[in-house]
Amino acid sequence: MPHIRMPRRALLAGAFALTLTAGGATGTAVAATAAGAAPAAAAPHPPAAAPHPPYGLRLDGAGECTFPMKKQIEDRPWALQRLLLDELWAQTKGKDKSGASVRVAVIDTGVDRANPQLSGAIDVGAGKDFVDPKGGDGTTDTIGHGTKVAGLIAARPQQGTGFVGLAPDATIIPIRQNDGQGKGNALSLSQAIDHAVARGAQVINISQDTDVQLSADSELGKSVQKAVAANIVVVASAGNDGMSGQKRKTYPAAFPGVLAVGASDRNNERAVFSQPGDFIGVAAPGVDMVSTVPGFGQCIDNGTSFSAPYVAGVAALLRAEHGDWSAQQIVWQIQNTAERAVNGRDDYVGWGVVDPVRALSQDQQAPKAPVPDPGPPPATAPQAAALQLTETAQERQERYGTYALGIGAVLIAVIAGTATVVRDARSRRRRLQ
């Protein structure tokens, strides 16, 4: 079963666990354990000495998703085969017209810089570690989750593999905020977002979520709004609890201004695990996703965790190409050019499955808010044929004309016949005389 998120729990100082929205039959699966955790406290100011609940996140590695890998995945991944990369990168690969690289903050488990596809993509000086008490630059990744997320955005081309990031000239700001062992919570995520804003991020990717219903005036909500107000495209995964089909909001994806991303499969349909809800903005490939792992090589994984960076990569390309567009316009462009299965949006894939090439090629005008397609015009109702019970005046005139012609023909024939008889009779009389 792909990814089980942790239920609501009481956490220290109102902070709660955020689950990494990845996992599946192949690759890394995420599960939550919370033995003995207490119900959520209602007191606005929990005691400072409250014990840290014994919750944790368990990552169950499977198949080839171990690291470092000894071999690379040679083939072009299916999520890239559906694209014409030359057309996608016709204008930019992640650098703006001045040559500056678009800055994408990856708030996750860290981003490993040893993988050669990422070593040249990371701004180490801008990174930060919110997990290790000693601090750090955000390039420690003991889980591999953040390294995979970053690779989908900005992995550089490398000989021996067909995998490459969607914006291979973009720059990654590595922010380690979750270690997969319960240390990632709303408070640290709020701090990580603030750090991304301070370090000049133009796009922020968040591949984790909680179903605790948060308000906009929560610490996390305030930090998200600060990022949105700073004209940053904030992309977040919707979560992987969609197997039941139950619709519910997850955060930070459901905050206003955030582009919430669900997962689609190879048929451009919602992946069975992708969380549905009225907050879904778009969907993107999230099944059998190839990306970088710590050390060397690539692996395959599943989850909305890997749909979000696919969209973040497109956002980075658009930011590079259209520096005059606002973050909201970037989001609208992604939504307007998505491939739709219905005329408008739905709660499963939002405005549709992201089409990167279309987003970068149908960009001649500044985008507006998405609206439903008009659809085909209504068909004209069939009308019964008129039934004539009597003849029309024209038909009557035509009938009279036919009669006149017939009578005339008969008269001519009679006259001609009479003339012939008279002529023959006269001829006989002459012979008898």
Per-range role (PLM):
Residues L20-A32:
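C-terminal segment of classical bacterial N-terminal signal peptides
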Residues P51-D169, A198:
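Active-site core segment of subtilase-fold serine proteases
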Residues D132-L214, D265, A341-N343:
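Subtilisin-like peptidase catalytic core
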Residues S237-V258, G262-F279, S291-G303, N343-V349:
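Active-site-adjacent substrate-recognition loops and nearby beta-strands
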